Amino acid sequence: LLASLSGNLEASGLSHPDVNPMEVSQTVRKLRGTILDTNGTPVIGASISVKGTTTGTISDMNGVFTLDVKNGDILEISFIGYLSHTVKVGTQTDLQVVLKEDTQALDEVVVVGYGVQKKSVMTAAISRVTSDDLEKLTPTRVEDVLRGKVSGVSIMQNSGQPGAESRVRIRGTGTINDSNPLYIVDGMPLEGGVDYLNPQDIQSIEVLKDAASAAIYGSRAANGVILVTTKSGKKGKAVVNYDFSIGWQNPWRKMSVLNAAEYETIMNEAYVNAGMDPIYDDPSKAGVGTNWQNEIYNENAPIMNHQASISGGGDKGSYFLSFGYLDQEGIVGGKDKSDYKRYSLRFNNTYNVFENKANKFFRSFKVGTNLGYTRIISKGISENDNFSGPLASAVMTPPNESVYLENPSAEDLAYYEKNYPGYVKDDEGRIYNVIENQEIVNPVAMMQTLNNNKDWDKFVGSVWGELEVFENLTFKTSLSTDMAFWGERNWFPVSYLCYMVKTEKSRVEQTMNRGMKLLWENTLNYKRSIDKHNFAVLLGTSMERYDSKKVKGTALNLRAEDDHKAWIDFTNSASPGDQHSEGGATEHRMASVFGRLNYNYDERYMLELTLRRDGSSNFGRNNQYAYFPSVSAGWT
């Protein structure tokens, strides 16, 4: 009634002393609308929302929608493949909106296996994240770039360890043992994940989610493929960029635990209920006690990121040079126990050797390089330990126990020397309290005994040449390598945490690994259009070899319990039994041929045929070759 009265008053230009204009404008009413395209065809499933609110709906089979609105609301209408549209709500009760096609989105070029395609003629399920999306974030790992950005892709963090990788699943779990997708950076399939890659060097990421898009990569693409393209320079003056960011990390949440008084009260009740005498005289005097989570967590752990780059180019070529430094301190144990540093260097360039489109043959030839080097240094603690790790002990150690042996007397010291040989001290000489509670120990003392060091050097590079043989036919050859050297060192001092957790002889464990992959690929791309018929043909070969070696050694009786001196060659091993070594090697070979045919009629009816034949040393002796075909079709 009020809305109707207001409309009549406004139409007649009258006013009424009992009607508040502000109240009228805030009155909620039903608005009906129709969403059409430029041809007058209803747009089904268009999104209509009120700006700044959670109110929204979608258009039905006839392009019609109804929505609760107020005068002055701003409606935002959007649909994939069309330009977004905004409308301000006035006094209208029926609305008609015409959406225009987003020709730029339809003409967008998307990276696919061994080439690019226009988005408008794709028949496969491919999602894309670009550098524009990255500029809004400060991710530390490539997987973090995809979090919440790509439908059908779940990103789960394995642990809170600084630099820890995330588990990526594309459209669910593919196999029981290994569901990780195949990562390909600048055409190079990677071994050991993408830790080495600096997210700020990324130009775009394409996620190949179905068999139609991933079949071109054969046997390794069963769990999907993630294609990463790094940045390159553009024609123009040199552009210098420097970015710096710093943040602070804290545990997302802490478990709610009893304080000392509550713990002693509960324990007394348990003993009484079991028919025994209470074990604590006056729980109220225990006070708050020790919150062990606060003792091991490193509050406001800093994370710092430096990024510098220079890029540019001219008529003959382009270049991109970048340096990155990431330092992430762990939220458990502090910098001495949990830390992650990554140094990255990248150089990409292209050079046009010659270009003459007037030639019938050999119209152009260009070469390029994509080179990336990364060094990672990290420290960490044991992860995902249900019982004996410091995190588990932090929530299960009694709160009425203290961190340190408080004001120890001569008798206390003598008792510790006799019964707890190797009791643990902090850097200032204070003695940690020994808590005998089976494998549940003083978590702060345990942190003092953990010494884990990892380092990793990785170089991924490729050199390529591309020749336009004649119009529409391009030949490309590339030689790539992935070299990695990584190692780990753990050392354990003589220590006594409880009768079940103790180290009677100091020891050090060292592991050294190296791996090298060589990849040689050749492709022919041919494109042809006849009237409204468009063809694209890809033929290619791929030859790959991978070799790795591992050496591991263990030695007892360190000469010095010092992180800088705890090495295998600096021990006092009394017998051959005090030392142990082992090693191993792996090798892998693969040879493949592949092809793809794309056809579309007037960019409305599309067909794609893909076939790859893999020969792999990983296959069974009697089945060393396998075929991976796919067929997909679509229309718009």
Describe the role of every protein-language-model region.
Residues 1-355, 359-367, 460-461, 553, ...:
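Short, small/polar-rich motifs associated with maturation and membrane association
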Residues 120, 234-289, 333-334, 338-340, ...:
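Surface-exposed loop/interface segments of Gram-negative outer-membrane beta-barrel transport/assembly proteins
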Residues 141, 165, 223, 303-307, ...:
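Transmembrane beta-barrel architecture of outer-membrane proteins
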Residues 230, 259, 308-314, 347-351, ...:
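Residues on the lipid-exposed face of transmembrane beta-strands in outer-membrane beta-barrel proteins
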Residues 232, 313-314, 353-357, 361, ...:
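Outer-membrane beta-barrel strand-turn architecture
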Residues 244, 326, 607-619:
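Transmembrane beta-strand segments that form the barrel wall of outer-membrane beta-barrel proteins
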Residues 595-610:
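Short, contiguous hydrophobic alpha-helices characteristic of membrane insertion segments
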